A protein has these predicted regions:
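Surface loops and adjacent helix of pleckstrin homology
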Residues: 54-56, 76, 115
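Mature extracytoplasmic domains of secretory-pathway proteins
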Residues: 61-87
Length: 145
């Protein structure tokens, strides 16, 4: 009977998803790939953010809080650049560090990636959105790098 109970306890613990932090988010910014691969991720849920970077001999993980102004800035940049309507190109690229941005909150909800480039007409808008996330990462993780 003890083995039976222990089995169900282990089964219950195994079924708890440790990746929940990474699947339930409002905003996601990630960069990955390249000849010398890197993996960089930023997940934002509410006012909490989780950042990780692996590559180039570094391994950084950091959790931090965001202010309401920082969240409003992200949403404003997404709206000003009409993030949802940015068009991805369909070229095939290899050994390229690509950036992916996923927005699950608000009217600009969409998933975009420059893995096969962004259409020329939308490059400036894409760069504005990516720059906003990049600046946020740089300001919050300067001490961790």
């Amino acid at each position: 009977m003890k083995r039976f109970i222990a089995f169900f306890v282990l089964l219950a613990l195994a079924s708890c998803s440790p990746q929940k932090k990474y699947s339930d988010f409002d905003y996601s910014y990630s960069r990955s790939g390249g000849l010398s691969p890197i993996y960089e991720n930023l997940w934002i849920k509410g006012k909490t953010a989780h950042y990780s970077f692996e590559g180039q001999g570094k391994n950084v993980k950091k959790d931090f809080k965001l202010s309401q102004d920082e969240l409003n800035n992200i949403q404003n940049v997404l709206e000003q650049n009409n993030f949802r309507m940015i068009q991805e190109d369909y070229k095939k690229l290899y050994d390229y560090i690509s950036t992916s941005i996923v927005v699950k909150k608000g009217a600009q909800s969409a998933s975009k990636s420059d893995a096969s480039y962004i259409m020329d007409a939308d490059k400036a808008r894409w760069e504005n959105v990516a720059k906003t996330f990049r600046q946020l990462i740089d300001s919050k993780t300067a001490d961790a790098k």
